[in-house]
Amino acid sequence: MASPEMEERLRKIIVDQLGVEPEQVVPSASFTKDLNADSLDLVELIMSIEEEFGVEISDEEAEKIQTVADALNYLETHQSNE
């Protein structure tokens, strides 16, 4: 399970990148359907996540990240030790 700190860091990135309210950023939220992100938004979001968490997300993996929970699950298993 993702730590509260990880969730908060991810929430801040999503709010900043997509211009949504923090309350909208729930694990089940779809980036495209619920948070109205387009393909460019998603690319920028993935880049911000990579930078913030020190991970490298392949294009193939990025396509699988559809929801906030998907992003958290990816980070849990791939984040480098800080």
Swiss-Prot record:
Q: Which residues cross the membrane?
A: none
Q: Which InterPro entries match?
A: ACP, ACP-like_sf, PP-bd_ACP, Ppantetheine_attach_site
O-(pantetheine 4'-phosphoryl)serine: residues carrying this PTM: S39
As for subcellular location, the record says: Cytoplasm
Molecular function GO terms recorded: acyl binding; acyl carrier activity
Looking at the record, the residues that make up the Carrier domain are 4-79
- What's in the keyword line of the UniProt record? Cytoplasm, Fatty acid biosynthesis, Fatty acid metabolism, Lipid biosynthesis, Lipid metabolism, Phosphopantetheine, Phosphoprotein
- Protein name (database record): Acyl carrier protein
PTM details?
4'-phosphopantetheine is transferred from CoA to a specific serine of apo-ACP by AcpS. This modification is essential for activity because fatty acids are bound in thioester linkage to the sulfhydryl of the prosthetic group.
**GO terms classed as biological process:** lipid A biosynthetic process
Which Pfam families does its entry note? PP-binding
Q: Name one GO cellular component term.
A: cytosol
